[in-house]
Amino acid sequence: DAKVIDPEFYPFGVKKYEIPGSTNVKKSFDSDQLSILFNAKPKKPEQEKARDFWFFSFVCNGMNVKDIIHLKWKDITDEQIVFIREKTKSTKKANIKPIQVPLSDFAVMFIKKYGNKDQRKSSFVFPILDESMTEEERHKRKQNFIRYINQHLKQLAKANGLTEDISTYWARHSFATTAVRKSA
């Protein structure tokens, strides 16, 4: 076995570079803050749409916005949404289990309000992506849509006395925190 890097120049080890630990604090809203955001009166339609997508993520067990964007009509039944996370679709794992999310009244209303009229099983539920886009175009569209939600959500939150740090990830963490508190 030939050594590729001379130990003298190896960057890791005692008194050398250490990979930093995670400092990512999971941020979430408590029930009072969720109520304020849910009942907030948007000043612009963009704020309403941003809030609605945020709460759709929340009521769908904290579904990632990337997964919402990729939902197809085949993923939705009368009772639930069944999907495989975009994050895990391309992994080599053999036992990837689909996620099942019960459809709440809010989720049904939201899908009726924002869903594509074209409800073929192969069509996207929401008019954000379309089949004719390249992977690069889809990636840009997803990033722009998430930025759009975050930008308008921050405005709505600020106008209602909530933190401007809010983002789409807060829906995931707020759902998880709420679920843990309810089961405690």
What spans do the regions from the language model cover?
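Short, charged phosphate-coordinating catalytic segments
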Residues: 2-8, 57-80
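Short, contiguous acidic/charged loop-to-helix segments that flank catalytic cores in large enzymes
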Residues: 42-44, 86-102, 136-145, 163-170
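C-terminal catalytic core of tyrosine-transesterase DNA break-rejoin enzymes
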Residues: 55, 59, 63-67, 172-184
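Active-site/catalytic core of tyrosine-dependent DNA strand-transfer enzymes
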Residues: 34, 104-163
